[in-house]
């Protein structure tokens, strides 16, 4: 903190980004694996926090890391390194199919890939029950075709994966599902939003245009996505 972060957070805010090497260190030092609000994820990464064994890791240690990062006195920095990850990854780990988690999680915990939570929309805001981003099942039943937009998405500009709330059923909360959308699938575009502050957190407008998402990327059960969304903060 004293030598590699605090002296530079002002520059990073002005540049609207934090160097990738800093985020990578969050992975290699084992911090990301310990910041999921659950057991330390030893199955998916060999990285370890040097001072605490995985068996002794608990929420108190998570608090210590968050508190230490907050010494930078930059909300943009803190949101950059743990914001999108902290709310986008828990639903995947808790409710994603094992094959999906096995494929995606190691890269995230090692700091090589980034993930965010994509819920809020231009018209619905955080009113999740009324979101309109739509996912229709393809004729062969192998993919969801996603169309719609998300707004104010923390870390979205850099993210490889989007834990995304979509409408798959009727109006209201019982028609919401959660999909893990991969940028590499194509049809995903992102643009930075210039907000009043937290510039280095990467607040983003995300557009999905005919994005093909494998049905295996469904997180939880179809039309029961509220459970997965709540898991982002538990």
Positions of the model-derived regions?
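Amphipathic, small/basic residue-rich leader segments at the start of a protein or domain
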Residues: 1-82, 99, 103, 107-110
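Glycine-rich phosphate/pyrophosphate-binding beta-alpha loops
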Residues: 124, 151-157, 197, 234
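A short, Trp-centered hydrophobic/proline-enriched beta-strand micro-motif
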Residues: 111-119
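Short glycine/proline-enriched turns and hinge-like loops at secondary-structure junctions
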Residues: 127-129, 155-160, 173-175, 199-201, ...
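A short core secondary-structure module
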Residues: 142-191
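N-terminal glycine-rich flavin-associated loop
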Residues: 77-99, 125
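Glycine-rich beta->alpha junctions and the first turn(s) of the following alpha-helix
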Residues: 188-234
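A structural signal for short hydrophobic beta-strand segments in well-ordered beta-sheet cores
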Residues: 133-137
């Amino acid at each position: 903190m004293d030598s590699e972060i605090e002296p530079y957070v002002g520059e990073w805010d002005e540049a609207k980004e934090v160097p990738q090497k800093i985020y990578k260190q969050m992975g290699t030092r084992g911090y990301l694996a310990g910041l999921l609000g659950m057991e330390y994820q030893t199955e998916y990464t060999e990285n370890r926090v040097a001072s605490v064994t995985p068996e002794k890791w608990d929420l108190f240690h998570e608090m210590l890391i968050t508190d230490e990062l907050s010494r930078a006195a930059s909300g943009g920095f803190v949101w950059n390194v743990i914001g999108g990850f902290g709310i986008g990854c828990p639903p995947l780990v808790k409710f994603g199919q094992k094959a999906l988690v096995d494929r995606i999680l190691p890269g995230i915990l090692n700091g090589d890939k980034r993930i965010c939570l994509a819920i809020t929309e231009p018209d619905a805001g955080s009113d999740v029950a009324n979101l309109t981003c739509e996912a229709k099942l393809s004729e062969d039943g192998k993919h969801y075709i996603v169309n719609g937009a998300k707004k104010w998405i923390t870390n979205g500009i850099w993210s490889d994966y989007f834990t995304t709330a979509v409408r798959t059923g009727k109006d209201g909360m019982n028609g919401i599902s959660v999909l893990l959308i991969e940028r590499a699938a194509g049809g995903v575009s992102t643009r930075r939003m210039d907000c009043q502050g937290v510039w280095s957190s990467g607040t983003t407008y995300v557009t999905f245009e005919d994005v093909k998402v494998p049905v295996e990327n469904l997180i939880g059960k179809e039309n029961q996505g509220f459970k997965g969304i709540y898991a982002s903060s538990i």
